């Protein structure tokens, strides 16, 4: 258990740092204010798949809080929580044992993308906007529009870049029974 907790702490630190750096360097605006294409969610997908839901939550939560603090002066806590929840849910879209055995085929890709799409719809389309209305007294039509756009953009980003990262990672793993004795 101790070895696992050390891995989670290290993965959280590295993952959160990557979340901040990628979010800072690659921020593609959309027509909706304060909403952009965020490639760090693809990296969050990989880390969540490899290190589990706790690491995924912490990477998303800490990474988003730090990114907001550095870029905007203060975190927007309802969306910080949303990033943590996305990291948590992404871990349930991939069977870690299968991925580390080098298996990430069509069945795994479909499962991963169903889970990540549903997570994005629920987190960004429902939870974060309701939080914005309750915590920050934001206008509902504004935050639900932002949430829906963010959810769809993040789902597309994860579907393309996250799936690609997971597929590339699986390709680096040796499949059991793949070595033949000469």
UniProtKB/Swiss-Prot annotation:
Keywords on record: Cell membrane, Membrane, Transmembrane, Transmembrane helix
Subcellular location: Cell membrane
Membrane topology: Multi-pass membrane protein
A GO term from the CC aspect: plasma membrane
InterPro entries assigned to the protein according to its UniProt record, in alphabetical order: ECF_substrate-spec-like, UPF0397
Transmembrane stretches, start-end: 8-28, 42-62, 74-94, 114-134, 146-166
Any single Pfam family the record assigns to this protein: ECF-ribofla_trS
Family: Belongs to the UPF0397 family.
NCBIfam families: PRK13661.1
HAMAP family membership: UPF0397
PANTHER family (alphabetical): UPF0397 PROTEIN BC_2624-RELATED (PTHR37815), UPF0397 PROTEIN SPR0429 (PTHR37815:SF3)
Protein name, per record: UPF0397 protein YdcD
Organism: Lactococcus lactis subsp. lactis (strain IL1403) (Streptococcus lactis)
């Amino acid at each position: 258990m101790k070895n696992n907790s050390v891995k989670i702490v290290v993965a959280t630190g590295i993952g959160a740092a990557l979340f901040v750096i990628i979010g800072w360097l690659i921020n593609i605006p959309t027509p909706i204010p304060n909403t952009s294409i965020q490639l760090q969610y693809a990296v969050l997908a990989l880390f969540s798949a490899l290190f589990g839901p706790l690491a995924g939550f912490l990477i998303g939560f800490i990474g988003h809080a730090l990114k907001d603090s550095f870029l905007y002066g203060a975190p927007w806590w309802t969306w910080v929580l949303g990033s943590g929840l996305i990291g948590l849910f992404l871990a349930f879209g991939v069977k870690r044992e299968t991925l580390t055995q080098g298996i990430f085929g069509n069945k795994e890709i479909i499962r991963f993308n169903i889970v990540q799409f549903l997570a994005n719809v629920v987190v960004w389309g429902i939870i974060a906007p309701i939080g914005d209305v309750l915590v920050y007294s934001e206008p509902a039509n504004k935050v639900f529009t932002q949430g829906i756009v963010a959810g769809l953009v993040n789902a597309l980003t994860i579907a393309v870049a996250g799936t690609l990262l997971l597929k590339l990672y699986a390709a680096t793993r040796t499949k059991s029974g793949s070595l033949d004795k000469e």
